[in-house]
A protein has these predicted regions:
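N-terminal segment immediately downstream of the Sec signal-peptide cleavage site
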Residues: 30-96, 101, 163-182
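An exposed acidic His-Trp-rich patch
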Residues: 81-135
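Extracytosolic low-complexity repeat regions of secreted or lipid-anchored proteins
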Residues: 113-172
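Basic/polar N-terminal segments that are highly enriched at the extreme N-terminus
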Residues: 1, 26-33
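Mobile, glycine-rich extracellular loop/lid and propeptide segments
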Residues: 11-13
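Bacterial N-terminal signal peptides
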Residues: 15-26
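Short, Lys/Arg-enriched N-terminal segments with co-localized hydrophobic residues
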Residues: 1-8
Length: 182
């Protein structure tokens, strides 16, 4: 066996070991990182702050471990909003929203009242906290407003009567039809 042939035999002998190690590494990484979580929701009459109300619908997918998010939907102000990030959104305005980023958590209030305790929502397999851009028809592809929002399969404000599982910053909370799957 010449030097060249011996070298080829060593490479051929190592190929199965390298492939086995690669498969093991990929499968370990895949099992350690959970997959994306899908969600969809429909919320009407989001309100609670002194002025304003909105409807919000949409969905997408996110991964709380990696920070991946891709989600969007429709929105409309159903009553003039006079405070917070959506201040100036008039009744009947609003077309769509899309995601700026996935947030690990946020603090929020459903009513904006000083007496209401501050609550915290955390992104997990049943709750998604987003920073989103909201668009009005006349503004084209330039976002009209940027605000945080929460969608959850669970009640995010058990201190308030009824189920509150969606929130828009500066507008309030509402009960939504919400589904999450992983």
């Amino acid at each position: 066996v010449t030097g060249k042939e011996a070298w080829k035999m060593r490479i051929i002998a190592l190929v199965p070991a390298v492939l086995a190690a690669a498969v093991l590494l990929v499968s370990t990484t895949a099992s350690a990182a959970p997959g994306n979580i899908g969600f969809g929701f429909n919320a009407r009459d989001i309100s609670g702050f002194p002025t304003g109300a909105a409807s919000l619908t949409g969905g997408g997918s996110y991964n709380p471990v990696t920070g991946f998010v891709k989600s969007a939907g429709g929105f409309r102000c159903t009553s003039d909003v006079g405070q917070g990030p959506l201040a100036g959104c008039l009744s009947g305005e609003g077309v769509r929203w899309d995601t700026v980023e996935l947030r690990r958590s946020t603090t929020f209030k459903c009513t904006g009242s000083a007496a209401e305790p501050l609550k915290t929502a955390t992104t997990d397999e049943n709750t998604v906290v987003l920073l989103a851009d909201f668009y009005r028809a006349g503004d084209g592809n330039d976002e009209s407003f940027t605000a945080q929002m929460i969608v959850s399969a669970d009640d995010i404000a058990p201190d308030i009567a009824g189920i509150q599982n969606v929130w828009i910053q500066g507008v309030g909370c509402a009960s939504a039809i919400a589904n999450f799957s992983s």
